[in-house]
């Protein structure tokens, strides 16, 4: 049965197989017919994905597929008969494929060095790849190998002509990027062998830019040279890299500070981004806009490094201030100019304070030549202009008395080297001696200050304008004698000064400054006109009010004034040497020769000031003369009262004024004289002891006050120290908290680094898969 079934089954199986083959052939014929036929409008096939030749070559080299890379180079080579290969300016297509880069400027040779693939490096170098090709940051393949520490690749590149002096955009050589000692030793040995100057290599780019800029300046033309890819100018490069001298030359040649590159960056954007402070200052000084915007709408401060943020804010403020100054100067330029003559005119002396008047008088004395006549105050270059516009530019004493200027140009003027002759040998003239009748009538109605004969040079208007101002000065008894005392006493030799010292003069005596004579007036005439030097009084105060005020002041002084121990001793010395009342007065006690204390009003009231000089022969006048003589002879006879008179403790008693102290000294002299005549001195001893006890208690109080202040300071310091100690635990707790926070941050960063390593591995895997996919697609597309 098997033999019968075998022949029957064999033909059936063969027929089935033949039918299957026939169907397969039919399918192939139909598929070929459809593939060869043109597709219809609705049956168009999808376009095949095709990458650029450079991207395919980079992918093949990154994947290590050297056969595929070799086929691409062979396909790109046009052959010996093509015209492109014969042109030396145009690189061959195979060379263009070899040196092709991605968006970051990384070539296949860069990528092979990064991947440490020495086989691909050798293949590319043998095929003619550029060994010193730089990426967008200026890194060559040797920079990459040195940074990664690949000794074999570095040796191979150096053996095939790699430039060891190449500088990247940060100004670093491959030696500066070496990570290992072996790599550093290799590069140093190669530098020594080639004799490369490292510093000169780093300055090569700057020197080249400087040379080109000078050539442009000498040629008179500044070309608009731009980078073909970024559009950056020479000023952009110099600003970004800090080539200050190149920037100065470019700006001197008129280079625009608002030039834009491809991204809309100005040179100031580049300098701020790279943190070049000197470049930022230089560009800001030449009008670089702080508000210039890029194509992305960013200002220089938005792109700036953190180190130059404060500098940019300062430069922006300076630009704003300079702009405001220019606008203000332009506005002032349109206004009318002030006459230059008014800039040197001196203001009126009546508007100055007493201290300023004295300073002005000192300056005028220094300018005045010795022994020459003429006015002591006034600039010779101003002439009549100053006299016409400022008639009151006349040095005045503190109480308003005019300085000695004679109206007669022929009268002699004594030099400043002989002050004693002015004080003792000259007589005073009346203030109305040189005035006309009309002017004399006008000045009689004014209760202000009467001026000397020199005032005839002044105008009536300025006189009436100045005297009410001086009359408004309130002469209070509490007014201290200012610094003109020291100036007045310094101008007189001590050996010739027989006048009453300021602290020892009677309040009733009026000290008058000497005035140069215009005529030989007799002594009696000067006495009659003595009231012309009186202090100005207030117009609104009546005579009865002045008398009542003076009486109240005298009563208050007698009841409230205290006397120091020094004053008491001084009074005892003076009282011990009081001469007999029948002794005649000295000739120097003539009231007309007695100098007046400036700025001090007679506290006895106007009744004594207005007493006629004819009554000076009465008992009261004789007694006043004897008192003045006693006080004058005190310092002259060798008493040691000078230091006590000038000591600050004795200048004022219990806050009193100089005038009050003079009254106290006069009363003290009288009382001590009476006590000296009395045989019983018990009251004086008791008063002295009480006074000493009072002084001792006062000193103890002062020491206690100082001690209390010191204790307060020490208490404050202790409190602050305790507060610092109390705050220390809180500071330690804060430091511990910050330390824990930093530790947590470090742990998080470590975790992120681990995750970054995983991501890097995944990225590499995806890149490999992408390269394989590109190769598959390229093969299928063929």
UniProtKB/Swiss-Prot annotation:
InterPro entries: Ankyrin_rpt, Ankyrin_rpt-contain_sf, MYPT1/MYPT2/Mbs85, PP1_Regulatory_Subunit, PRKG1_interact. Residues 301-332, 681-782 form a coiled coil. It is found in: Cytoplasm; Cytoplasm, Cytoskeleton, Stress fiber. It comes from Mus musculus. SMART domains: ANK. Regulates myosin phosphatase activity. GO terms for biological process: signal transduction. The modification N-acetylserine is found at residue 2. The modification Phosphothreonine is found at residue 560. ANK repeats lie at residues 104-133, 137-166, 230-259, 263-292. This is Protein phosphatase 1 regulatory subunit 12C.
């Amino acid at each position: 049965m098997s033999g019968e079934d075998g022949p029957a089954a064999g033909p059936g199986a063969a027929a089935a197989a033949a039918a299957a083959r026939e169907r397969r052939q039919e399918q192939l014929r139909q598929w070929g017919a459809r593939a060869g036929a043109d597709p219809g409008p609705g049956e168009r096939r999808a376009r095949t994905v095709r990458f650029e030749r450079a991207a395919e070559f980079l992918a093949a080299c990154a994947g290590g597929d050297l056969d595929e890379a070799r086929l691409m180079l062979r396909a790109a080579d046009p052959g010996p008969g093509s015209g492109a290969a014969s042109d030396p300016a145009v690189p061959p297509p195979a060379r263009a494929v070899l040196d092709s880069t991605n968006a970051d400027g990384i070539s296949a040779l860069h990528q092979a060095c990064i991947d440490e693939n020495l086989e691909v490096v050798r293949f590319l170098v043998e095929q003619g790849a550029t060994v010193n090709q730089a990426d967008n940051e200026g890194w060559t393949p040797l920079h990459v190998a040195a940074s990664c520490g690949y000794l074999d690749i570095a040796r191979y590149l150096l053996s095939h002509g790699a430039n060891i002096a190449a500088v990247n955009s940060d100004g670093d050589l491959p030696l500066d990027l070496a990570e290992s000692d072996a790599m550093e030793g290799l590069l140093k040995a190669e530098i020594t062998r080639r004799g490369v100057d490292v510093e000169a290599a780093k300055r090569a780019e700057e020197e080249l830019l400087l040379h080109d800029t000078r050539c442009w300046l000498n040629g008179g033309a500044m070309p608009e040279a731009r980078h073909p890819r970024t559009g950056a100018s020479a000023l952009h490069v110099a600003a970004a890299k800090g080539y200050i001298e190149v920037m100065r030359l470019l700006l001197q040649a008129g280079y625009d500070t608002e030039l834009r590159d491809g991204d809309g960056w100005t040179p100031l954007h580049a300098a701020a981004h790279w943190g070049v402070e000197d470049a930022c200052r230089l560009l800001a000084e030449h009008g670089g806009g702080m508000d210039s915007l890029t194509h992305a709408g960013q200002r220089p401060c938005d792109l700036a490094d953190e180190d130059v943020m404060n500098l940019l804010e300062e430069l922006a403020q300076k630009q704003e201030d300079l702009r405001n100054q220019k606008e203000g100067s332009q506005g002032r330029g349109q206004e009318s100019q002030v006459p230059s003559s008014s800039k040197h005119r001196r203001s009126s002396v009546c508007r100055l304070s007493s201290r300023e008047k004295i300073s002005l008088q000192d300056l005028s004395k220094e300018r005045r030549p010795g022994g020459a006549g003429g006015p002591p105050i006034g600039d010779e270059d101003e002439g009549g202009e100053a006299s016409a516009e400022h008639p009151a530019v006349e040095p005045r004493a503190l109480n308003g008395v005019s300085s000695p200027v004679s109206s007669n140009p022929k009268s002699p003027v004594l030099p400043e080297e002989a002050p004693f002759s002015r004080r003792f040998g000259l007589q005073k003239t009346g203030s109305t001696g040189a005035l006309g009748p009309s002017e004399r009538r006008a000045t009689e109605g004014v209760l202000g200050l009467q001026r000397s004969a020199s005032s005839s040079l002044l105008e009536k208007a300025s006189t009436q304008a100045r005297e009410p101002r001086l009359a408004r000065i309130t002469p209070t008894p509490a007014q201290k004698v200012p610094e003109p005392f020291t100036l007045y006493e310094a101008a007189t030799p001590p050996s010739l000064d027989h006048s009453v010292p300021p602290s020892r003069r009677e309040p009733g005596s009026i000290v008058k400054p000497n005035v140069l004579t215009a005529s030989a007036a007799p002594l009696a005439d000067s006495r009659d006109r003595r009231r012309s030097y009186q202090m100005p009084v207030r117009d609104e105060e009546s005579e009865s009010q002045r008398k009542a005020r003076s009486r109240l002041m005298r009563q208050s002084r007698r009841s409230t004034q205290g006397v120091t121990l020094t004053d008491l001793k001084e009074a005892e010395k003076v009282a011990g040497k009081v001469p007999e009342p029948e002794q005649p007065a000295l000739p120097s006690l003539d009231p007309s020769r007695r100098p007046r204390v400036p700025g001090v009003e007679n506290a006895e009231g106007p009744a004594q000031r207005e007493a006629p000089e004819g009554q000076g022969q009465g008992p009261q006048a004789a007694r006043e003369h004897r008192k003045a003589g006693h006080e004058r002879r005190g310092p002259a006879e060798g008493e040691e009262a000078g230091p006590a008179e000038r000591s600050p403790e004795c200048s004022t008693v219990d806050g009193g004024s100089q005038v009050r102290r003079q009254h106290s000294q006069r009363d003290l002299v009288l009382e001590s004289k009476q006590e000296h005549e009395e045989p019983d001195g018990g009251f004086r001893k008791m008063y002295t002891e009480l006074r000493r006890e009072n002084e001792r208690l006062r000193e103890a109080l002062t020491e206690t006050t100082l001690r209390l202040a010191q204790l307060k300071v020490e208490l404050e310091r202790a409190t602050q120290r305790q507060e610092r100690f109390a705050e220390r635990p809180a500071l330690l707790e804060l430091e511990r908290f910050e330390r824990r926070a930093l530790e947590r941050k470090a742990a998080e960063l470590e975790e992120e680094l681990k995750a970054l390593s995983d991501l890097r591995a995944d990225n590499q895997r995806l890149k490999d898969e992408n390269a394989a996919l590109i190769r598959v697609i390229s093969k299928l597309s063929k």
